[in-house]
């Protein structure tokens, strides 16, 4: 299917323009009064969905481009919440959400609730991935109707946030940049603002504002692990689930400044004032030419300069965290790029990330790669799986435990029949969101009992802070005791398709402690 066909299909499924309802003609049972208006959703069977609710008072357009998100203001109006908003500006990449129509007017969220009678349901807030460059809530994978049908005792929210050069652009070093001291981390501040809206309004949807779990995958998972490090954020959530993403997905201020300078050169701009005159599509074109990876910044202001150390010092000790990774993370990218694309990608990344290593560390890396068996791509794929995803996941479990907090850790192993994909990045998403029909990555529907069990664990964690399942809650009738990660035994839950079981990390050998774990200090991504 061509991109324009996908775009129109998404519009047909979820798109449109929400309008004010001024004639009083709406179904009161589908309306929820919030601070910034009354929003009217649509019902599918026993699930009511509210799409495209703004969580800011003003959208980040015009002079508000690259400014922190603005609080909502009281509003007595009534509005449709029938359609997804446009996606944030970003590079399409692998993300369906960025194939959809894009706009700077993008800070909206969706709410999925069941009719099942209950007040104060646990709330799960989804933060999408896409390398901080792409993605969006309109992705059919993140349609949570199936999830809420199966788990009617939770409310699910999906949020959008600014991406790429709109969400993570360092500007304060420019001659007129003194009023842009937050621009390098706006995407994260958007997420905090969305969580504030949820805290203040979710009770009207049957949710418990004091029992919120944030969860995400890839950049969304990284966001989930970074948000606890932002001052004042803990009042909005109690726990987090991070699927294949951690606090390593960040950069230094020096790297941020270098990225901005490259952009300015391509666009012929010298000041923020110049940049404000540039059309969003032009910025997008420039970013795609530069191949510059825009990510959150360890600026010492919004985020600490050492995000791992912050966990070790107890920054998240009052939160429960559930983190994990997939067995063959980078194989997804091999499969997606094809041989020529992968070879180019990995050559550039190795030059960028490994060329400057000290000789003794290069020797360790080379030794690791020599021991990897498999196809031509597997040594590189395994190395980058370790440095980008697996080692950082284990390290954050370590640091959370050192800091006195609770960490639950998983290792996801089901494979696609595709010999390249195997158990690649994002392959668990169709399991989490109950979309067995979506097999583009999985190549097949995974075992139904396994899938239900994994979802039950996620929901149980959101409810209680512990993902263990008693026999009566477990789909196969067998109790699943998920141990806390600790510094001695380093126990994890192996999410094997036909044998979910706890194990010591040393038994599974998830990370190479000697030859790849040290790479986490370089914040590779």
Which positions does each model-derived feature cover?
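Non-catalytic accessory segments of hydrolases
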Residues: 2-174, 178-185, 209, 443-450, ...
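Gly/Ala-rich beta-loop-alpha elbow adjacent to hydrolase catalytic centers
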Residues: 216, 220
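Substrate-access "cap/lid" subdomains that shape
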Residues: 97, 193, 200, 204, ...
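Mobile gating loops/cap/lid regions near enzyme active sites that modulate substrate access
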Residues: 390-525
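Alpha/beta-hydrolase active-site loop
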Residues: 170, 180-203
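Alpha/beta-hydrolase-fold catalytic nucleophile elbow
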Residues: 160, 215, 230, 241-244, ...
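Short glycine-enriched nucleophile-adjacent loop
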Residues: 221-233
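Active-site rim elements
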Residues: 94-98, 180-185, 246-251, 307-308, ...
């Amino acid at each position: 299917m061509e991109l324009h066909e996908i775009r129109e299909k998404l519009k047909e499924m979820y798109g449109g323009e929400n309008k004010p309802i001024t004639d009083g003609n709406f179904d009161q049972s589908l309306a929820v009064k919030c601070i910034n208006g009354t929003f009217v959703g649509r019902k599918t069977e026993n699930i009511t969905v509210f799409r495209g609710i703004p969580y800011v008072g003003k959208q980040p357009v015009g002079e508000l481009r690259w400014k922190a998100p603005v609080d909502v203001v009281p509003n007595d109006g009534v509005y449709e919440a029938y359609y997804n908003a446009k996606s944030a500006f970003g590079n399409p990449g692998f993300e369906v959400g960025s194939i959809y129509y894009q706009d700077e007017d993008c800070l909206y969220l969706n709410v999925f609730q069941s009719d099942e009678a209950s007040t104060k349901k646990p709330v799960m807030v989804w933060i999408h991935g896409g390398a901080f460059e792409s993605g969006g809530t309109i992705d059919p994978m993140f349609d949570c109707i199936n999830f809420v049908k199966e788990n009617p005792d939770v409310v699910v929210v999906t949020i959008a946030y600014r991406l790429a050069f709109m969400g993570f652009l360092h500007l304060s070093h420019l001659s007129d940049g003194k009023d842009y001291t937050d621009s390098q981390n706006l995407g994260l501040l958007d997420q905090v603002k969305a969580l504030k809206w949820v805290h203040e309004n979710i009770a009207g949807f049957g949710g418990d504002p004091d029992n919120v779990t944030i969860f995400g995958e890839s950049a969304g998972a990284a966001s989930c692990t970074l948000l606890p490090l932002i001052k004042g954020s803990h009042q909005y959530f109690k726990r987090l689930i991070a699927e294949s993403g951690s606090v390593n997905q960040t950069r230094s201020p020096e790297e941020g400044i270098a990225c901005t300078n490259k952009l300015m050169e391509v666009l012929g701009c010298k000041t923020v004032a110049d940049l404000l005159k540039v059309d969003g599509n032009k910025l997008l074109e420039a970013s795609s030419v530069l191949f510059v990876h825009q990510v959150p910044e360890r600026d010492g202001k919004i985020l600490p300069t050492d995000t791992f150390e912050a966990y070790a010092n107890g920054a998240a000790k009052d939160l429960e965290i559930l983190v994990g990774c997939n067995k063959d993370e980078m194989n997804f990218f091999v499969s997606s790029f094809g041989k020529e694309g992968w070879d180019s990608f990995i050559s550039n990344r190795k030059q960028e990330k490994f060329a400057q290593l000290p000789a003794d560390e290069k020797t360790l890396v080379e030794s690791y790669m020599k021991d990897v068996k498999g196809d031509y791509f597997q040594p590189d794929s395994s190395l980058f799986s370790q440095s980008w995803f697996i080692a950082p996941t284990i390290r954050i479990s370590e640091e959370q435990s050192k800091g006195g907090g609770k960490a639950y850790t998983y290792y996801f192993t089901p494979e696609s029949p595709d010999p390249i994909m195997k158990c690649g990045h994002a392959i668990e998403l169709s399991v989490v969101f109950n979309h067995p029909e979506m097999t583009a990555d999985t190549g097949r529907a995974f075992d139904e009992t396994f899938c239900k069990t994994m979802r039950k664990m996620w929901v149980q964690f959101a409810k209680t802070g512990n993902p263990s399942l008693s026999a009566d809650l477990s789909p196969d009738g067998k109790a699943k005791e998920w141990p806390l990660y600790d510094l001695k035994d380093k126990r994890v839950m192996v999410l094997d398709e036909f044998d979910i079981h706890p194990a010591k990390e040393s038994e599974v050998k998830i990370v190479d402690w000697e030859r790849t774990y040290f790479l986490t200090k370089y914040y590779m991504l």
